[in-house]
Amino acid sequence: MFERDTSYPTAVASNDDEGVDAAIEWCLKQMKTGDTFTVWTSLKSNLKNCTSLERLVQRYDDVVHITGRGGEIPRAPGPVLMVWPDIDEIGQLVRFARQIRALCIITWNADGIRPWVTAMKPEVLGDGSDWEKLSTDLDPVVIEALRSLTLTINHNNTISAGYEKDQVVSVLLALKEAHVSMDADAMQGWVLAHGWSGKNPERLARYVQDINDGKRPRAQRALRADYVDNLRKKATPVETNIDESEG
């Protein structure tokens, strides 16, 4: 319910001259008439560490620089180039997906965004050796549970309290009690690729970590006894027998 659109093109670039140049070119190709090219860094001073990007921002009026620390958001529609973000910072920015026509990430810590890359399957620019190994595959039952939650919760609300928390925590506890394996990082990457944003992907991962550690966050919703069994049925491909007849 009210999930963000994540159908825009995505790319991930290596943190070297080849990757940065390819990222700039990729973003420029995504621009339409009237668009603004947004360059994001966590701190304002970070831009000075990449000469080609600093020069790009200074030279063109339709290229703007925003910072995560300042809470800035894309001011106009167009491609966004995030420079050295972590997965939580990606989650914060994509709250404003309506302004994002395309999203490219320049890598700093590949492991930190590997779950997002695994789930989003972006175009790889520059040196792609960081992405020869991706995150652990999620249990199909977990994917079905996340799909259901994605359609159920209001993504404008936090999952730290109220109805949304009850929904999320109840499902996670049910999965744990049914001995379904849950990978916090991979689940965070999956929901981020499927419209969750802000701090909710991060909070989901924290709930999973706590539950895997034996904690039981409070939740007021009781699920049906066959909830996980129904998820398993949905996750199991249906085999169709086709009778072949001669003549």
Regions found by a protein language model. Name each.
Residues 1-247:
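Short, flexible loop motifs at catalytic/binding sites
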